[in-house]
């Protein structure tokens, strides 16, 4: 546990020490990694792991993130995937000065089952959020109206809010029935209302599977909330990861417009991974977008569920 001891000692420059750890899918090791913990994001000061070397464990290759599709560039792909999986550097609700309340980050999530293991004694069953819950201090801080007086703010690494990506302010909360909800706040107040209206209309249309949103009040703000659709046996794979994991064919590359290329390659990627009903889902989603006048459709705000 050399890294843990080093990371916990205050006053030392722990960020320069090479550490060795394993990317896990539940209790399956999928990649051996070496690298450093760095404050790698431009605007927010979130320590993240950046790999210098990544080695795929062949016997568990099928459990890798879909995004990591090539052994030749596995280190580059891991770092890109990892950066997409955590807080966006465009988030405006992240405190400028932080006092971390726990030892080191495993980067568990409520949308997949990947995590960083530092020691072979660490077990998925003891640490994952689905079974063990999580502290709410990190999410409380993101939504507080008093960030300027939090100097420093106290946050936990071991929180699903650290791996809630995207630009909107968001947090996870678990109710008394142990059901997890994602709560989102928008800067202009319009987005959360749009999500609730879209839920009403899509329910009436009944043509495509969708995530239902409702309104709630969180820390004096009108927010939208949705139930977690990922379970202990599934993970969410963004369409962008499926899209980027398949090489472009010459035929698609020669299409005239970018929307044509994007659509054609996405459908080709869905067929490559043999996603049941995937192409039909995309077509119906695009029809619903036209009805809703949704011009914000992109490959990171929809996706597919994978059994794990």
Ranges and model annotations:
Residues 2-287, 291-293, 303-308:
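Phosphate/dinucleotide-binding and metal-coordinating scaffold of catalytic cores
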């Amino acid at each position: 546990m050399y890294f843990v001891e080093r990371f916990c000692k205050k006053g030392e420059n722990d960020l320069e020490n090479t550490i060795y750890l394993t990317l896990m899918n539940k209790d399956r090791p999928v990649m051996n990694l070496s690298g450093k913990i760095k404050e790698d994001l431009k605007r927010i000061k979130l320590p993240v792991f950046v790999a210098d070397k990544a080695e795929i464990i062949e016997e568990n290759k099928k459990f890798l993130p879909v995004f990591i599709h090539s052994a030749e560039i596995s280190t580059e792909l891991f770092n890109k995937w990892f950066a997409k999986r955590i807080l966006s550097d465009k988030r405006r609700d992240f405190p400028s000065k932080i006092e971390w309340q726990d030892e080191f980050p495993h980067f568990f999530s409520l949308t997949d089952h990947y995590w960083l293991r530092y020691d072979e004694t660490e077990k998925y069953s003891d640490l994952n959020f689905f079974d063990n819950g999580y502290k709410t201090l990190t999410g409380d801080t993101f939504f507080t109206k008093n960030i300027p007086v939090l100097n420093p703010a106290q946050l936990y690494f071991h929180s699903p809010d650290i791996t809630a990506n995207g630009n909107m302010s968001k947090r996870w909360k678990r109710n008394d029935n142990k059901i997890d909800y994602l709560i989102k706040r928008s800067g202009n107040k319009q987005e959360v209302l749009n999500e609730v209206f879209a839920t009403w209309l899509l329910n009436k249309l009944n043509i495509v599977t969708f995530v239902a949103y409702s309104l709630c009040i969180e820390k004096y703000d009108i927010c939208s909330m949705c139930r977690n659709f990922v379970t202990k046996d599934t993970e969410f794979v963004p369409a962008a990861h499926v899209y980027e994991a398949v090489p472009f064919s010459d035929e698609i590359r020669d299409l005239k417009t970018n929307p044509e290329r994007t659509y054609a390659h996405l459908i080709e990627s869905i067929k490559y991974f043999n996603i049941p009903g995937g192409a039909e889902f995309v077509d119906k989603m695009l029809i619903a977008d036209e009805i809703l006048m949704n011009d914000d459709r992109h490959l990171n705000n929809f996706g597919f569920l994978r059994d794990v």
